[in-house]
């Protein structure tokens, strides 16, 4: 088992890996996953669809986990890009003791404390207000209903000022129920 030119990997029989996953252990004892395409070259610095699921690989070819690409996308502990509604710890609240983020809370049965609802489109991109100049909050229409999101993409409830302006007028506010839907 050995790397060739830092882009290819051969097994103990000298056979190059093609269309296969490779699981290695780093110096800290953590697992790292790599994927090798049909040419045998390691996939790096891109999204790759494998068995109808999307994965992202960093510049070194490692499959990425958690919040990635400026916190606009999220991949689970299995590395699969998430879409739709996801209840997650916001990216700023992650433990950043290492250079990579591992979402240890996912599926752990931990309480909901500190988790917020985020919505990811079919392309995997997190919904945030359309206009960053509109203030702290903005609305997005999902399945015919309006929801409010803050600049980090966390769904909001209660009264929110969703319009920009120098004056704080009541017309600028909308109410969002516990389910996040505009009322």
PLM segments and residue spans:
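Extracellular adhesion/carbohydrate-binding repeat motifs centered on closely spaced tryptophans
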Residues: 1-183
């Amino acid at each position: 088992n050995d790397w060739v030119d830092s882009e290819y990997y051969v097994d103990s029989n000298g056979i190059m890996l093609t269309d296969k996953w490779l699981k290695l252990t780093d110096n800290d004892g953590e697992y790292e996953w790599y994927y090798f395409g049909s040419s045998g070259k390691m996939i790096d610095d891109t999204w790759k669809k494998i068995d109808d699921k999307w994965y992202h690989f960093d510049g070194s070819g490692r499959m990425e986990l958690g919040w990635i690409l400026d916190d606009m996308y999220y991949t689970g502990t299995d590395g699969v890009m998430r879409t739709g509604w996801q209840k997650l710890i916001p990216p700023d609240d992650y433990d950043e003791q290492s250079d990579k983020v591992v979402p240890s809370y996912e599926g752990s049965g931990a309480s909901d404390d500190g988790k917020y609802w985020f919505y990811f489109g079919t392309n995997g991109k997190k919904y945030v207000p359309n206009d960053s100049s509109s203030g702290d909050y903005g609305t997005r229409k999902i399945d015919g209903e309006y929801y409010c999101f803050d600049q980090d993409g966390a769904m909001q409830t209660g009264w929110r000022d969703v319009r920009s302006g120098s004056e704080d007028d009541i017309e600028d506010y909308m109410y969002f129920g516990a389910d996040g839907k505009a009322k």
